[in-house]
From Swiss-Prot:
Coiled coil: none annotated. It comes from Haemophilus influenzae (strain PittEE). HAMAP family: UPF0225. Pfam families: SEC-C, YchJ_M-like. This is UPF0225 protein CGSHiEE_01665. Belongs to the UPF0225 family. It comes from the Bacteria.
Length: 160
């Protein structure tokens, strides 16, 4: 977490225009929780920039956290240089589900590259979480990963 403490007085890597301490830093230090899906998206991007993999894990929907491989996430973070984040669109899908489309710029082996994605976020007990589409997901008739009690196809699965 030493990268976090040195970043507190700097501009936030999420490019919100705020200092890290007043932006994603308060989420990383668990002084507050993101109030919107976009704030969570920005804080997760910043966590990757700062190589704060524990934050990536705890902000993934709880039912998926044990499916993540922190060692692989750490290796990926260690080998990636992030250069910028652009939020393209934020959508409120339901009262507890939102989508954030973003473009993240990173240094590739030979040139800058961009990763564009539409991520789904779900609010569980007043906290936002990322629904990770890269891990095993339930079948459409199984209960949703968010714990809503609905079938996956009628809940988060309908947005992935």
């Amino acid at each position: 977490m030493s990268e976090i403490s040195t970043a507190l007085s700097e501009d936030c890597p999420c490019q919100s225009g705020h200092h890290y301490a007043d932006c994603c830093g308060k989420f990383h230090l668990r002084q507050a929780f993101p109030e919107t899906a976009e704030q969570l998206m920005r804080s997760r991007y910043t966590a990757y920039v700062l190589k704060n993999i524990p934050y990536i894990v705890v902000t993934t929907v709880p039912s998926q956290q044990t499916l993540l491989e922190p060692r692989l996430l750490q290796e990926w973070a260690d080998n990636t240089t992030w250069l910028g984040l652009e939020i393209l669109k934020t959508e409120s899908l339901t009262k507890t589900q939102s989508a954030v489309e973003f473009k993240a710029i990173f240094q590739g082996e030979e040139c800058e590259q961009a990763h564009q994605e539409r991520s789904i976020f779900v609010k569980i007990e007043d906290r936002w979480y990322f629904v990770d589409p890269t891990v095993s997901l339930p079948t459409m008739k199984q209960p949703c990963v968010c714990g809503s009690g609905k079938k996956f196809k009628h809940c988060c699965g309908g947005f992935l």
